[in-house]
Every structure is written in structure tokens, then in C-alpha cells.
């Protein structure tokens, strides 16, 4: 809406300042103009309105067409506005001084003295009233120009009133006096029209003036109420504005906070997206690993099925072998009984000759051809008997040799003759080897001849027939190679009794003499030696025969004694002869364990004779002899240094290539690193070696010697014990030498203060198949150390053991992320591994924080099952 279309304008500013309402105009006047101007305008407005109403009423009463109806003029907003504006301007001009139109107005006042002229006249006198009353003017124009100058003829009205009243008081000179039209007369004559018009006009003027005043008062009250309402609303709006401003500031701050949160959320979203990408990659790798594991599981299941099938087949074959063994033993017993009966028949049917004729071929007694013939025949049969028996006893352990031909010969030769009654000649070169039956028969005959010398000689026909029947006996041999060990248990025990104790020196009376007759039949020594041993054998023992029940008992003991430890075997050998026979068989000394005992080198040398089949040797926490009362510690340490190495050498030499596992631990000063050098010389098939010592840790020279001699080692534990007297002997050079000597290592345990990142990285680079790694008392493992070591290898690591080795949580996380096959992480730490003063409160608090951080890793996914933390002293 343009400014010219607004209904109200400022009288001071002119047309260019128009307003929509009176309140806005009033506010403009209050703020832009003085209070005097506003007051003058208010008073002028009231006077002008009252004068206009009075003039309109007088004009209507006199019939003078001065202006339209005042109500109509007041009803027109434009006319009222023009009246207000003109009145206010003229009032101000009169207050300031005489205007240019002042002379005309003064002249008009002198000509119309009776007229009441208001000081707010707006229209100049040059504009006649006739122009205002022209019928051609429209009401709007009349309303605009009629009240420019309003003159109310109050003097004329009063003059007319006085003339009328005087006319009524004096009667006219005419014949008939008329009635007095005045109101004071008592005659009922009617008043004059002028009086009536005057009265009516005056009444109407009063009414209109009162109405106008009432309207003005109401307008003033309304304007005041409106102004109050506007002021209240403005106050409310200002309060609302302040509240909105505060809310806007709060909203701005909230917007800034939301912006920051948005940035944080965007960063978090980007981080989560990266984590999701990493998780997706990890999930893909895990899926691939799962596929590989499933394939491996299927392979393992197939292997398990094959192993189950193999076990079932083996069980079936074992059952059949046991059945055949039982049948064989029964047949063997039957054959032994039959042989005994045949020997009894032979001994009862054949006559015996004096021992002189059997031993010297007819020296003493009758010397005829009848006497020499049987003597020569006996010599022919007796001569090859010794090599036959020796061959059976020496080759009894061969699985291809039939047990049916070994056990009877050994059992018969152990107690069927007395060596004092017969002197065996040396075997002839041309004698056949398979003349054992004849020799056995001749021995039996000679043995019986010693007790039956008074019987006359008989014909040799029956004896020859019995010998032929013995030679035509059926022979049974084991045909299956895998059953040789099972079916040969009895023969092995008998043969070991016959030959085993003779090869080694006898340590004392507890080991000597239980089976002297067997020794006599087993070793082809000279007559003097046999005579000396025969003197120590009682006649009752020399005539003993090993019964089948004893063979069965020895077989059962052999099955049991294989599960006994070394100490129990040594005690079991003291029970009886049969127990000693089984307890000292090399087949039960496959696992030798000596621990927590005081031993000497001679004891180890004695054990060496039974450890020829040992495949595991463990020496742990052994102690030397006690220190003498007058012996100083230095002398004692010097005298006991390496004191068991001679006996250990005997053990290693006896075991030889059968030894697969060698463990030497906690044997300070009595076993040095020379033990590994001895093992490299005698036991080249070693697969697992453990050597841990606090006084003599291994060096790179010993590792080189062991690597040159034993190339098949897959498990090596050579970490020095703590506290070590030579902590820097095991260094990075040792780690490099281990990696070069055994690239196929599967398990390794190293440690010491000399181990560093360089040696561990070289070890990881060379040993690509390493599955178990143990670090003992190594310097702190940080994330950088873990990254350097894992960069070179350890991709197939399955178990990581950190003993007394400080480690950070980030290092464990790195190991777990790089070593995909890692199944177990064992961390054994103590407060002394981190701090030199573990008893101080600060050290204990820091150690508790470290342990808490390590324990927090167990709550991470994937760590709860593989991470095992063992804390020693501090928490």
C-alpha cells in the first residue's frame, strides 16, 4: 500500500508522512514533535468539532444552505481529516503571528460584528458561501469546503428573538390586536416560526454538541485503551522478542553442539566403516581358514577312520596271534613232555659206562673194542653239542629262528647234566652243525651214567632208534614277522637268562649266580673256567628244569614290568630270581628316569648293561656324593664337577642309535655341556633334547657339535636356568646357530639375558616350521619386537610360552593377528621380572596395573580361550 493511500498524514511533515491509524500518528507526534504541538492539535480539534456542529444546526434552523448535515460531514473520514488538518495549521499560524490572510479576516470581522467568529477559521473570506451552497457540488466536495470558515449568526438570532419578544409585548395599532406569540404571554397564541426554529435549532445544537462531546470522550477513552493495549502488547512482544533471542542463542549453541556431534559421529562412522572393512577382510580370511580347517578335519576324520580300521585289524591279528601263541605253547609243552619221556626211555634202555670211559675213551677198566666203540660214538655226538647249544643261545633273539627248537634245548641244557661228570672236548671241524639231538641224548646218558655206574652196558639199538625218532620230530617255525616278538617272549627271557648277564661284569652277589647252569651251557670256555664256575653251583640247582608255569609267569611279569619306573624295577629285582630275571631284561629298560636321588658314575655304568634298548633317558635333579667334613666348598665343587659324565657316557654308548629322547635338567656342576657333546658322538638318532643348567649353559660351540652329530632333532630345550652363573653365554649367536643347524625344528625353548631381537628374528627366519616357542627370562617383548620377529617367520606357530618374560598387551595382539594357527598363549610373570625392588608399594601398584591390562585382553573376542596368565608373587 502506497503512502498517499493512507488516511492520516502528519500536519508538520506534510503529504509524504501518512499513517494508517490515529495511534500511529499520535506516536509519531510524540516521538518526532513537541508536546505543545500535540496539545494545540487536540484542543483545536475539539473546538472545531463543536463549532462545526453548532453552525450546522443554525443553518438548518434558519433554512440557510450553508453546508450539508453536520452528522454527514462528521461521518465522512476525509472531511473530518481535512477539518483537523486545516484547523491545526491555522491555529498554529494564529499562535505564531498574523498570517497573510489576517487583514481579510479582520475586515470580515468588522463587517459581521454580530457573528460569532471562532479563532480556528480555516477557509478564507474570498470564498463566498454561495459557492459552498451550489447545488452542483457533490456531498464530498461540500464536506471538503463547507467548513473552511464557519460563522454562526448568534447575534442575528438573538436580535430576532428580542424583536419578536418586543412585538408581542406592545399591541399593534390595528383594529384587532393579535395575540402575543411570545412564550411569556398567557394567551394561547402560538409562537412565531422564528422562535420555534430558534428553539429547535438551539436544542438540536445542544444535543449535537453533547453527542459530539460524548463521542470525543469515548474516542479518547478508546484511544487510551488502544494505546494501553498496544503498549502492553509491545511489552509482551519485547519480552517475547527477548525470549526468542535467548531461545535463538540457545538454538545456536545447540546447533554448534549438534555440529560438533555430527562431526564426531561422522568420524566415528568413518572409523566404524574402516573397522567393518577390516572385519569383512578378517571374516573372509576366517572363512578361508574355516574351509582349510574343514578340509583338514575331513582329512583327520579319514585318518581316524583308517586308524580305527587299522586298530581293529591289529586287534584281530593280535587275538589270532595270541591264539596261535597259546597253541604253540601247548604244543611246546607237549613236545617238552614227549622229549622228557623219550629221554627217560633212552636213559632207562641204554646202559651207562664209567665216566672215565666217556671222558677219555676207554682209559681204566676193560680196554677192548667193545668198550672203545661206544666211546668213539659218544665223542662223535658229544663234540658238536657245544656249538649247537651256543648257537641257540647266541642267536635266540633272532625272530626267524623257531622257538620250538630253542626253548627245549635251553631248558634241557640248563639242568639235564652235571658238568663235573663230563669233560666236553672241543668241537671238530668236520662235525655237522645239526647234531644237537644226538649231543643232548649223549649228555643225558652221561648224566645218568654218573649216578648209575653200577648198571651193565646194554645194546645201543634202542638208543639209536630213540635218536632217530627225535631227529624225525616235526618242526614248527613262526612265519609272520610281526608276530615274532609276541611268540618269542618265553625264548627271549630264557636266552637273556642264559647269555645276558655274562656279557657284562657282575657288580655283586645279588646279580650273580641265580642261573649258573645256564651260563655254563651258554659259553664255550676252557675246562678250567667251567670247573671254577661248576664249583659254585649246587647239585640241586644244576638239575633244575624251567617249567611251563615259570615261563608263563615270566611272560606275564614282562608285560607288567614294561610299565614300571626305574626305581621300582631296581626294587623288583630283589624279590626273587624270576623277578630279577625279568626286571633286568633290556626290553623293560626302554624308558630310564632318574630324578631326585644321589647317584654315582659306577651306578650309571651298571645300568648301561640293561639299557641297550633304551629310547628315552631322563636325568633330573641328581645330586653327587655328600661333602666331607674337612672338605671346603671349592674343593667339593672341583671334585664333583662332571663326576657323572663317565657313567653317562656308558649309558649313551650302550643305548646308541636306539636313544631318541635325552633330558638333562637341574644337575648343576655334575653334568656339564660336555654331555651334549657325548650325545652327538654316540646317539645320532636323537629327536628331542633338553639341557637346562644354571652353572654350565650351552654355548654356540656345543650347539654346533650337537647339530653336526644329531641332524634329526625336532624338539630342543636349551634355555638356561635362573639364576644363571653365566647369563650371557647363551646369546644371539647361539640362536643363529640353532636356526642354521635345525631348520626343521618344531619345538624350541630358549632364554637368557643374551637373547635379543636380532637372534630371535634370525631364528624365526630359518625355522619356518616352528610350532612351539618358549622364551624364558628374555628382555621385554614389545610390539616392535613382535613385529620384527613375526616379519621374518612364525607363521605356523601354535603355542607361545613366555616364562618370566615381560610382555605388553599390544605385542600379544600382534602375535595373535599374525600367527593365524595360534592356539595357546601362556604368560607366566612375576613382579621380580619387572622391578628390581618388588616389595615397594609403587612397584606393586604398577605391577597390578600391568596384570589388569593383560587380564583385560581375555575379554576380547578370540582371546578368552587361548590366553592363559599365571601371576607369581605380587597379585
UniProtKB/Swiss-Prot annotation:
Bias type Polar residues, positions: 347-356, 395-416
Biased composition (Pro residues): 170-182
Cellular component, GO, one term: cytosol
Pfam families attached to this UniProt entry: F-box-like (PF12937), zf-C2H2_FBX41 (PF23165)
Keyword Phosphoprotein part of the UniProt annotation: yes
Location of the F-box domain: 496-540
Complexes and interactors: Directly interacts with SKP1 and CUL1.
Protein name (Swiss-Prot/TrEMBL): F-box only protein 41
Species, as recorded: Homo sapiens (Human)
Phylogenetic placement of the source organism: Eukaryota, Metazoa, Chordata, Craniata, Vertebrata
